[in-house]
Amino acid sequence: MEFPIVNIGREHVDRFVNEIAPLVCNEYIKRMTHGEHVIYPSTCIAQAALESGWNVNAKTLFGIKGDGFVSDTTEYIDGTYINIQDSFKCYPNVATAIQGFYDLMQNERYRAATKAVDWVEECKEMYNCGYATDPNYSDKIINITETNNLTVFNDYCLAILRGEVSAEETDNSGRVEELADKLENGDYGNGRDTRAERAAQDGYTLEEYEAAQLIVNERS
């Protein structure tokens, strides 16, 4: 059973999902194995897409409030959408942003969401728990999930946890970091096409190459 690849036909969507999905699934499986409170991968990915505008390079992938940087945002207050400035946490890379999201889910505030019976109820509870003020928030992340077939990642992770497929097939974070180091060191040259081709010759997938290139960009 191969790791799912989303191919919706919209380049920015496909790239976003396929770059962060392996990292989200790794974190989900790890947290489930340790008995922690979790949110389905599909919901995590959908929230990241909505909060960042499908921008994997966004300073705040999940729109988590906290010390970091100040940015314009829209909040729904007293029945009205209001543009304000607020402070958001900033993470050094996608992997740590995902870890930060799942760390946040350990808060008792989100217990109704992490105990939801399915991903649809989970999306509804994310709004009820106060993750966002937009009354349409749940509908938006449900729509993103359904439109882009994100539940395939839930199925894959649950298959691993049931022992139906080896976790080694999705635990590629070490390979991605290794490839990022090689790219940064110039082991595969400077041309993008050349680097991708040489990485493929060494057995790396295109998804691993794209994820590694993202890490390199974040380091610079």
Model-derived features with residue positions:
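Repeat-associated, polar segments at repeat-unit boundaries in modular proteins
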Residues: 152-155, 200-220
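Extracellular glycan-binding segments that recognize GlcNAc-based cell-wall polysaccharides
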Residues: 126, 174-178, 214-220
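Acidic, Ser/Thr/Pro/Gly-enriched interdomain connector segments
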Residues: 7, 167-174, 178-179, 185
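A general structural motif at alpha-helix termini
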Residues: 48, 130, 145, 199-202, ...
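Catalytic cores of secreted/periplasmic lytic hydrolases that degrade extracellular macromolecules
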Residues: 1-170
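Surface-exposed aromatic
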Residues: 120-127, 181, 191, 197
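Extracytoplasmic Gram-positive cell-surface binding/anchoring modules and repeats
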Residues: 173-175, 184-196, 204-206
